[in-house]
């Protein structure tokens, strides 16, 4: 046997065994490595050369025995489209373990599509190649754009044919996160282990994500957990600020899809708008627009309310004190989101974030004229003609001496536009990855004009977005 030159840690499984069910990925009839993210592997101390061996591929499928990995399916609950489900968990996923990057930060190595677990609830536990490659390219694009996100380490085709309306090739995604602790993780701890387990999970969350609070864990007080909650709120606000600037619609902001770290997770029904509008939604199952673009800050606030419900006994010496602390912190969330959004647009416009008047004028024009935000911001960055309706704004904006160099670092030339992603995936599922690799190269170097051909910068043909619909692909 070709021995692995590394060993994953089992930090979550050891710290929270009641929330981790030991499991193994299912056997694949003919596994083949489709793509491997060498740079990400190196950054985590994983050897890409070994990962390409037959033993390495089996490792990436969750098939290696101990001691190399101690894979587990994580338990969590969740509100899905507002409806609470007490036991969700990793129904088609596994946490292989954690790898430590050079800076000492632990990162979850997590599978998606690895087969049934005890949480599958009758589903087959599998994933198909198109949606898996979709998550790979969009998550890596988001990372390159500076958005907090899970990342993609590898895609493996399984050699299995799977029925999803039509027959599709099976695949497993290997993704990476600073952790996959969710709002739904706290909901599960609250109903399964009460405040004792919730406090244990909160303490573990502090050690993984909020080092400034670690010193307080020797003698934690209500202020420790209030600070934790406020730090989580800030992470969510910062992330939604970046989504808003980029015109990104997540599409499934359930509490089980909201990570405590603030990293974007689960890209199944997401999309990038090409007409900037508040009512934009693309998910085939979001019938009533719960998760439409303009609702994203509000929905994250709703999710944060569900989180703080699980922490109330930790936030004060009495129930009334805990409730007051929760309400005060949560009451600041709308302002945190607005501040984050204004900051993002100020940076995109090359202005100081204190220039709220210009930023607000720009945002009003976005909703009035519905431009392609990517093209618009690059036209400002490159000092080319703005679209109709923005002429007067641009004239006044230029008098404020915008920082064009700073703008070049945040306003992308390339994003994973919906029509380009769909074209690349259509070819990929029949074995032609040329368009996929071309698009991946461009969107992972989004500010470099030489990273891809000019046609990858262009919006779709008129009418495409009106009919465009996304699917989870499960």
UniProtKB/Swiss-Prot annotation:
Q: Classify the source by domain of life.
A: Bacteria
Main role? Nucleotidyltransferase involved in the post-translational modification of proteins. It can catalyze the addition of adenosine monophosphate (AMP) or uridine monophosphate (UMP) to a protein, resulting in modifications known as AMPylation and UMPylation.
Residues engaged in binding Mg(2+):
257, 266
Q: Which family does it belong to?
A: Belongs to the SELO family.
The UniProt keyword set, sorted, is: ATP-binding, Magnesium, Manganese, Metal-binding, Nucleotide-binding, Nucleotidyltransferase, Transferase
Q: What is its EC number?
A: 2.7.7.-, 2.7.7.108
- Organism of this sequence: Corynebacterium glutamicum (strain R)
Q: What name appears for this protein in its UniProt entry?
A: Protein nucleotidyltransferase YdiU
Q: What is the lineage of its organism?
A: Bacteria, Bacillati, Actinomycetota, Actinomycetes, Mycobacteriales
Q: Where does ATP bind?
A: 89, 91-92, 112, 124-125, 175, 182, 266
Under catalytic activity, the entry for this protein gives: L-seryl-[protein] + ATP = 3-O-(5'-adenylyl)-L-seryl-[protein] + diphosphate; L-threonyl-[protein] + ATP = 3-O-(5'-adenylyl)-L-threonyl-[protein] + diphosphate; L-tyrosyl-[protein] + ATP = O-(5'-adenylyl)-L-tyrosyl-[protein] + diphosphate; L-histidyl-[protein] + UTP = N(tele)-(5'-uridylyl)-L-histidyl-[protein] + diphosphate
Q: Where is the active site?
A: 256 (proton acceptor)
């Amino acid at each position: 046997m070709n021995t692995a030159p590394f060993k994953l840690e089992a930090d979550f499984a050891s710290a929270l065994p009641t929330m981790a069910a030991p499991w193994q990925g299912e056997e694949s009839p003919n596994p083949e490595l489709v793509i491997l993210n060498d740079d990400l592997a190196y950054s985590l101390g994983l050897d890409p050369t070994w990962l390409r061996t037959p033993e390495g591929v089996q490792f990436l499928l969750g098939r290696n025995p101990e001691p190399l990995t101690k894979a587990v399916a994580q338990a969590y609950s969740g509100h899905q489209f507002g409806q609470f489900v007490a036991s969700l968990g990793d129904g088609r996923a596994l946490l292989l373990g954690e790898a430590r990057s050079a800076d000492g930060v632990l990162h979850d190595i997590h599978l998606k599509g690895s087969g049934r677990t005890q949480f599958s609830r009758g589903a087959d536990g599998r994933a198909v190649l198109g949606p898996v490659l979709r998550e790979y390219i969009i998550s890596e694009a988001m990372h390159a754009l500076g958005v907090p996100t899970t990342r993609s380490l590898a895609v493996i085709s399984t050699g299995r044919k799977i029925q999803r309306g039509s027959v599709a090739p099976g695949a497993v995604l290997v993704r990476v996160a600073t952790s996959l602790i969710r709002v739904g993780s706290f909901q599960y701890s609250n109903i399964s282990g009460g405040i004792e387990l919730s406090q244990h999970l909160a303490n573990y969350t502090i050690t993984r994500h909020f080092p400034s609070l670690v010193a307080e864990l020797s003698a934690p007080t209500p202020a420790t957990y209030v600070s934790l909650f406020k730090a989580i709120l800030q992470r969510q606000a910062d992330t939604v600020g970046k989504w808003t600037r980029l015109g990104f619609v997540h599409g499934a902001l359930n509490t089980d899809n909201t990570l405590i770290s603030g990293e974007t997770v689960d890209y199944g029904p997401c999309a990038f708008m090409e007409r900037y509008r508040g009512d934009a939604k693309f998910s085939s199952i979001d019938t009533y627009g719960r998760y439409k673009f303009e609702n994203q800050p509000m929905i994250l606030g709703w999710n944060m309310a569900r989180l703080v419900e699980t922490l109330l006994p930790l936030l004060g010496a009495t129930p009334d004190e805990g409730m007051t602390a929760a309400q005060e912190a949560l009451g600041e969330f709308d302002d945190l989101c607005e501040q984050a959004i204004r900051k993002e647009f100020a940076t995109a416009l090359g202005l100081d974030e204190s220039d709220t008047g210009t930023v607000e004028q720009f945002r009003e024009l976005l909703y009035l004229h519905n431009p392609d935000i990517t093209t618009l911001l690059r036209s400002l960055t490159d000092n080319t003609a703005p679209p109709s309706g923005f002429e007067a704004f641009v004239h006044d904006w230029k008098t404020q001496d915008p920082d064009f160099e700073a703008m070049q670092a945040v306003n992308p030339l390339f994003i994973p536009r919906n029509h380009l992603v769909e074209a690349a995936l259509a070819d990929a599922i029949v074995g032609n990855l040329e368009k996929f690799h071309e698009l991946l190269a461009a969107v992972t170097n989004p500010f470099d004009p030489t990273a891809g051909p000019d046609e990858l910068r262009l919006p779709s043909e008129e009418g495409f977005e009106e009919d465009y619909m996304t699917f989870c692909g499960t």
